[in-house]
């Protein structure tokens, strides 16, 4: 069995060959990149198996930051015609909203200068082959540099019980809301608020379904769910616009309500607490991006993450991961996410990506959008 180990198993002399595919200049010169023209799809590497991709490093000189959403990364396993990984390049590496950022987690590390060194350590086994390509959905060319470090094995026996890596990117822009009416309830005195909100005064405030939640992952097959990056853009002022009261819900193998895993709030899902208003990075959870102010604490673009690496979530037939956008789905914000998971068989990693215009981030928010509510006292 292939052991994906850290320091604890580093001294074990496993049987493999160390390999790399990179963009080094085959002439011996220093043009160690490939140029990707506007509209071009380029295969960067084709790897022979059995093997396992252990580390990806990439950098590209972007014409504009929004190319983090214009450029698409795709990975195909074992000659499949559909990609198991299909994701905007920046989001694959955890850079939501096309915002470059230095950060460190257990499996993703964006490094200087200014988050341009893109690193990924998710293990990605394959039995026959791996094909890695990028598509430039912009109009301008850019130089692409890369390392794909992988192990190659004499036999696929080393890959017994290993799943294939998949990625699913999604966006809902904006989410449907009923927040102004919710805010009016909340602004009443606490007894009336509790009575109306929690004891059925308005049935919309009592959510016993995942029907209207934001979907982070919907997949069929036998596998494990390993985590997500979630990006929220509070692009306009809303009364009581803290989005963190949205509960996470994970349904396994088509089970009925209630799900096997039901959370207590968005900030609890990413293992923080009490409406965090600061950036924080830990190996398995954190806040990568926070843009709030004293006057508008939840203003603009936020990015958070939760990895299930020490506690992967097992499913055998299907999994459905969703989260409320505000309590009982009251808020209308721009939600996007990248989810990481493994399946026993290589399949398509989620629905096809939307057109590039529907992937681009919203412009950054002014302090108070015209015509929107001033801060609530």
Residues covered by each model-derived region:
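Beta-strand-centric surfaces of beta-sandwich/beta-rich domains
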Residues: 1-377
């Amino acid at each position: 069995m292939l052991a994906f180990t850290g320091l604890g198993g580093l001294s074990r002399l496993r049987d493999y060959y160390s390999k790399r595919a990179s963009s080094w200049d085959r002439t011996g010169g220093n043009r160690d990149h490939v140029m990707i023209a506007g509209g071009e799809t380029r295969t960067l590497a084709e790897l022979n198996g059995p093997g396992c991709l252990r580390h990806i490093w990439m950098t590209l000189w972007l014409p504009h930051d929004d190319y983090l959403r214009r450029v698409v990364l795709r990975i195909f396993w074992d000659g499949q015609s559909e990609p198991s990984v299909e994701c905007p390049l920046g989001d694959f590496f955890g850079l939501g909203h096309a915002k470059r950022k230095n950060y460190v987690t257990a499996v993703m590390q964006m490094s200087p200068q200014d988050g341009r060194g893109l690193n990924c350590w998710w293990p990605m086994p394959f039995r026959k082959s791996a094909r890695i390509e990028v598509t430039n959905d912009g109009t301008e060319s850019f130089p692409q540099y890369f390392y794909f470090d992988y192990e190659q094995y004499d036999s696929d026996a080393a890959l017994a019980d290993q799943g294939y890596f998949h990625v699913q990117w999604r966006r809902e822009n904006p989410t449907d809301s009923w927040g102004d009416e919710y805010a009016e309830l909340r602004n009443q005195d606490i007894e009336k608020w509790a009575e109306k909100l929690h004891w059925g005064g308005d049935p919309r405030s009592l959510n016993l379904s995942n029907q209207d939640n934001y979907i982070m992952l919907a997949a069929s097959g036998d596998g494990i769910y390993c985590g997500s990056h979630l990006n929220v853009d509070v692009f306009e002022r809303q009364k009581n616009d803290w989005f963190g009261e949205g509960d996470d819900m994970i349904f396994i193998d088509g089970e009925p309500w209630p799900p096997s895993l039901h959370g207590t709030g968005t900030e609890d899902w990413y293992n923080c607490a009490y409406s965090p208003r600061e950036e924080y990075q830990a190996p398995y959870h954190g806040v990568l991006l926070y843009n709030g102010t004293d006057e508008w604490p939840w203003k603009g673009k936020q990015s958070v993450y939760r990895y299930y690496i020490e506690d992967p979530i097992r499913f055998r037939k299907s999994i459905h991961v969703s989260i409320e956008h505000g309590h009982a789905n009251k808020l209308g914000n721009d939600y996007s996410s990248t989810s990481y998971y493994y399946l026993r068989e290589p399949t398509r990693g989620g629905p096809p990506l939307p057109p590039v215009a529907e992937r681009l981030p919203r412009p950054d928010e002014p302090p108070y959008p015209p015509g929107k509510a001033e801060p609530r006292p």
